Amino acid sequence: MAIVKMKPTSAGRRGMVRVVTEGLHKGAPYAPLLEKKNSTAGRNNNGHITTRHKGGGHKHHYRVVDFKRNKDGISAKVERIEYDPNRTAFIALLCYADGERRYIIAPRGIQAGVVLVSGAEAAIKVGNTLPIRNIPVGTTIHCIEMKPGKGAQIARSAGASAVLLAKEGAYAQVRLRSGEVRKINVDCRATIGEVGNEEQSLKKIGKAGANRWRGIRPTVRGVVMNPVDHPHGGGEGRTGEAREPVSPWGTPAKGYRTRNNKRTDNMIVRRRYSNKG
């Protein structure tokens, strides 16, 4: 894929940068793998806002993606690469030798016609899925499980990947893009290569309306609110924050560590912020 900078024919297109999608499927998605997706607009069952800045947006179906890749030993041919409105990565439609079709996260460099396979005996080839114990040290991987058989949870977004650093006993060490080094059970599965659509981070939407299409509502700064609405609010005329930056609920907003899961602390070998002050 490549990117293209749009000509400034209007205020909304000035500065807009898009990802060229020439190789993507132009037709409808595979209907048996679609599910209804209801929008909650960030509200809970009481109608209270639980996630701010959500609401509206275009309706779309959920594409059921196979994150487990547990159809071992059966070759699958990539039929096409598709756009998925639910994620930054593209998805690939696989057709297995027995006729079943499944969506997977499309790895970088994958094209229609490529044959993939999963299982312990699979070759070390981009798009193949194997248990980590069967993957050589130094291999770039993505779609990594955290528990055997649960399905991929790590490195699933566009351009994401991790590197297998070492294997010792029942655990392997994997370095994530954030710099964190984490222990993963060697029976967990991972896919060879990195996630495609790596130019996603270079996109510029160009106008506020493009975010509204995505269901993202405006974000209002705390300093322009009233004191009842935000710790930064109030004051006569234009005023600063008058304190350290915080969330509407008083939690420090810049660099404050919020991780609170001591149960899995022993799985982290090196924290992602170990190089920061």
Swiss-Prot record:
The keyword Magnesium does not apply. Keywords: Ribonucleoprotein, Ribosomal protein, RNA-binding, rRNA-binding. GO terms for molecular function: rRNA binding; structural constituent of ribosome; transferase activity. Residues 229-244 have a biased composition (Basic and acidic residues). One of its GO terms (cellular component) is large ribosomal subunit. One of its GO terms (biological process) is cytoplasmic translation. Gene3D superfamilies: 2.30.30.30, Nucleic acid-binding proteins, Ribosomal protein L2, domain 3. Residues 39-49 have a biased composition (Polar residues). InterPro entries: NA-bd_OB-fold (IPR012340), Rib_uL2_dom2 (IPR014722), Ribosomal_uL2 (IPR002171), Ribosomal_uL2_bac/org-type (IPR005880), Ribosomal_uL2_C (IPR022669), Ribosomal_uL2_CS (IPR022671), Ribosomal_uL2_dom3 (IPR014726), Ribosomal_uL2_RNA-bd_dom (IPR022666). Residues 50-60 have a biased composition (Basic residues). Residues 37-60, 223-264 are annotated as: Disordered. One of the primary rRNA binding proteins. Required for association of the 30S and 50S subunits to form the 70S ribosome, for tRNA binding and peptide bond formation. It has been suggested to have peptidyltransferase activity; this is somewhat controversial. Makes several contacts with the 16S rRNA in the 70S ribosome. Part of the 50S ribosomal subunit. Forms a bridge to the 30S subunit in the 70S ribosome. Belongs to the universal ribosomal protein uL2 family. This is Large ribosomal subunit protein uL2. It comes from Neisseria gonorrhoeae (strain ATCC 700825 / FA 1090).
